[in-house]
């Protein structure tokens, strides 16, 4: 599950108490395993694997203290930009979902240069790329061709649940 549950490292949970509250709510909905995916985005969210693992451990310890049984793991949601391009070029290890699946996103407002090249390089390093919330890339409009190219490259897609409803409008529903 793509979620921002680790406290204070991105636009998700602001603190440990909120993280625990969110996890309890997800448990009540029937989720038995959670994989939190904090943003890794240049200077805005400069999260490293060690920072993410440290926060994961703090949440796991809080769950144990409160006697909440919940399987919780962490990966990351990587923003495809020049910082990520360097990480890929330098072959830095990425935090992945099971099966070396790496969750990626790019700018929602303007096209990102070199997206396909970065995806290809990650694939050459053995990663399976998942594109997060493709319905949000408004500049693509109804350009199904770009999505088809990514699909043909072997990318998977992770939608927001609301993308399956009329919430985002007819263009998104048509995609």
Predicted regions and their residues:
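Short, solvent-exposed loop/turn segments at secondary-structure junctions
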Residues: 7, 42-44, 138-141, 165-168
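Histidine/acidic-residue-rich catalytic or RNA/ligand-binding cores of hydrolases
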Residues: 141-148, 167-175
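Extended substrate/RNA-proximal surfaces in nucleic-acid metabolism proteins
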Residues: 46-158
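Metallo-beta-lactamase
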Residues: 4-13, 144-151, 159-162
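An N-terminally biased module of ancient metal coordination in phosphate/nucleic-acid-related enzymes
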Residues: 1-68
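Short, acidic/polar
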Residues: 16-23, 84-88, 113-115, 172-175
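Active-site metal-binding loops of divalent metal-dependent hydrolases
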Residues: 3, 39-40, 77-78, 134, ...
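Active-site mouth loops of central-metabolism enzymes
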Residues: 5-16, 103-110, 164
């Amino acid at each position: 599950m793509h979620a921002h549950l680790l406290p204070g490292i991105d636009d998700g949970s602001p603190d440990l108490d909120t993280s625990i509250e969110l996890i309890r709510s997800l448990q009540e909905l029937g989720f038995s395993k959670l994989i939190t995916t904090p943003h890794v985005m240049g200077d805005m969210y400069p999260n490293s694997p060690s920072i993410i693992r440290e926060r994961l451990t703090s949440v796991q310890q809080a769950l144990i203290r409160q006697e909440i049984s919940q399987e919780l793991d962490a990966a990351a949601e990587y923003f495809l930009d020049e910082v990520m391009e360097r990480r890929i070029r330098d072959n830095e290890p990425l935090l992945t979902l099971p099966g070396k699946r790496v969750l990626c996103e790019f700018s929602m407002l303007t096209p990102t240069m070199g997206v396909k090249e970065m995806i290809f390089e990650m694939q050459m390093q053995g990663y399976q790329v998942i594109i997060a919330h493709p319905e949000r890339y408004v500049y693509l409009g109804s350009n199904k061709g770009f999505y088809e190219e990514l699909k043909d490259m072997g990318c998977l897609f992770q939608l927001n649940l609301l993308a399956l409803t009329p919430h985002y409008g007819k263009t998104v529903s048509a995609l």
